[in-house]
A protein has these predicted regions:
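Two-metal-ion RNase H-like nuclease active-site motif
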Residues: 1-2, 249
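N-terminal glycine/serine-rich phosphate-binding loop of ATP-dependent small-molecule kinases
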Residues: 2-86, 114, 142, 214-215, ...
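Residue-level signal for inorganic ion chemistry
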Residues: 16, 39, 66, 93, ...
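A generic structural motif
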Residues: 25-27, 91, 289
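Short beta-strand-loop/turn "lid" adjacent to the catalytic site in phosphate-handling enzymes
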Residues: 52-91, 119-125, 154-175, 198-201, ...
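Short, acidic/small-residue loops that bind anionic groups at enzyme active sites
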Residues: 86-100, 413-414
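Active-site core segments that coordinate phosphate-bearing ligands/cofactors
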Residues: 97, 104-119, 127-162, 172-183, ...
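A conserved beta-strand/loop element that lines the FAD pocket in flavoprotein oxidoreductases
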Residues: 194
Length: 479
């Protein structure tokens, strides 16, 4: 799982037993306000170190396949010599407001939706390509290959220039309904299909290890490399959110609400993304750019502590907090599509406590996720329960808040590994251990706890949420 702050590596046997987990961190760079970049070489170096540590005590001849979940939307540009042209521009980078406006207003949202089933968001890949064309023309002219983050790893490991349908959906370059590149979008961005990777389903084998990689890792050259999926689709596989009408909420660095569907569908208001799913079907997804990262920022940067649980012990009266928090540290995607939006606290008084502020952060993220749920409900999608994954799931209090803010039964699954487990499950399908993604999800995903919404608390949070909805429109002019 190639995340924003670290790569998590997981080793699973053919029966779904997790043998070992390793995590390797790498830096994130903010060279200018609103920018967010990483060095792809850091991803590769840490992944290689992680694989060596992960397999240090196993019979390496038994390694059958490698697959991926990964942060989406990032632009990795290589030249004709396969050298990285510039640092990768990440999913949470907000520099492309001008290019996003051009796509939505000049090309037009209706045309974009016709070409790709989506409109432009600042984090998507196509606006980043246009930004390079306008601001770094010499770098733009050097582009021979355009990749997404996890696909850079696949290329370094296997030599296969490829991507999968779920991750490619978030580039704004793909005709999602027909699962192919959009000629119209390529023309708009001034690129050719030769500069883009070959499209695969997430469970398909794209190649085997390069000989020099196999030698360094002491693996067989026959180890299969499977396409993998964008982190949210991989997490959905890892939580069993496949097939028709199932929901998963991810509380990672970003927050998502993910609804699987066997049929292609589009939100006509474009507040939800319409993407291909890793199971070969489709999904709708709402994405907020700052979720667990809000809690990390509040605890570590403001309070100066890493003991998140201790900060939550004094939170007592759920649904009665008078402080609101708008969770827009990096702008916002769903449903506002506003890269200039910013976080703020509202409603403090002399008796506001540290615990009130901590509670407001947890509730603000839950309210932000509910914004996307309300869009899904407006489309007639009936949801009464959801799986949940991501780092924020470790907080029982946050799980309870989400269940009652959303008025959903929240199923906690046995494994907390989300995208990494989903990647391993896709590898198992690609290696022929299971016939399809639905079968392995049915066999391996186990629910260990369910949080039931409490009617009295649901009513309190309903009132609070209706107040929350008024805040962004009221303060938007300040950004």
């Amino acid at each position: 799982d190639l995340g924003t702050s670290a790569v998590k590596l997981l080793m699973m046997d053919e029966n779904g037993n997790i043998q070992k987990i390793v995590s390797k961190e790498y830096p994130l760079y903010f060279p200018y306000p609103g920018w967010s970049e990483q060095n792809p070489q850091d991803w590769f170096a840490q992944s290689m170190e992680g694989i060596k540590e992960l397999t240090s005590e196993c019979d390496k001849s038994q390694v059958a396949g490698i697959s991926f979940g990964g942060q989406m939307h990032g632009l990795v540009a290589l030249d004709k010599d396969d050298q990285v042209i510039r640092p990768a521009i990440l999913w949470n980078d907000g520099r492309t407001a001008k290019e996003t406006d051009y796509l939505n207003q000049v090309i037009g949202k209706d045309k974009l939706s016709e070409y790709t089933a989506n409109i432009a968001f600042a984090g998507f890949t196509a606006p980043k390509i246009l930004w390079m064309k306008e601001n770094e023309p010499e770098n733009y002219k050097k582009i021979a290959k355009i990749m997404l983050p996890k696909d850079y790893l696949a290329y370094r490991l296997s030599g296969s220039f490829c991507t999968d349908m779920s991750d490619a959906s978030g580039m704004l370059l793909m005709d999602v309904e027909n699962r192919c590149w959009s000629k119209e979008m390529l023309d708009i961005c001034g690129i050719t299909e030769e500069q883009l990777p070959k499209l695969h389903e997430s469970y398909e084998v794209v190649g085997t290890l390069r000989p020099e990689i196999a030698e360094e890792l002491r693996f067989s050259e026959n180890v299969k490399v499977i396409a993998g999926a964008g982190d949210n689709a991989a997490a959905a596989v890892g939580t069993g959110t496949v097939g028709n009408g199932r929901c998963n909420i991810s509380l990672g660095t970003s927050g998502t609400i993910f609804i699987s569907s066997e049929k292609f569908g589009v939100d006509k208001h474009n507040a939800l993304h319409s993407f291909a799913h890793a199971d070969g079907h489709y999904h709708l997804m709402g994405c907020m750019l700052s979720a667990a990262s809000c809690n990390k920022w509040w605890n570590e940067e403001i309070l100066g502590t890493k003991d998140y649980a201790a900060e939550q012990t004094d939170i007592k009266n759920l649904g009665e907090n008078r402080v609101f928090y708008l969770p827009y540290l990096m702008g916002e995607r769903s449903p506002h599509n506003d890269p200039d939006a910013r976080a703020m606290f509202i409603g403090m008084s002399m008796d506001t406590t540290r615990a009130d502020m901590t509670q407001a952060v947890l509730e603000g993220v839950a309210f932000g996720l509910r914004d996307s749920l309300e869009v899904a409900r407006s489309l007639g999608i009936q949801i009464d329960r959801t799986k949940i994954c991501g780092g924020g799931v470790k907080s029982p209090l946050w799980r309870k808040i989400i269940a009652n803010v959303m008025n959903l039964k929240v199923d906690v699954i046995e494994s907390e590994e989300g995208p990494a487990l989903g990647g391993a499950m896709l590898a198992a399908v690609g290696c022929g251990e299971y016939p399809d993604v639905e079968t392995i999800a049915e066999k391996l995903v186990k629910v260990v706890d369910t949080i039931e919404p409490e009617p009295e608390l649901v009513a309190k949070y309903e009132e609070r949420y209706q107040q929350f909805r008024k805040l962004y429109p009221a303060v938007k002019g300040l950004f």
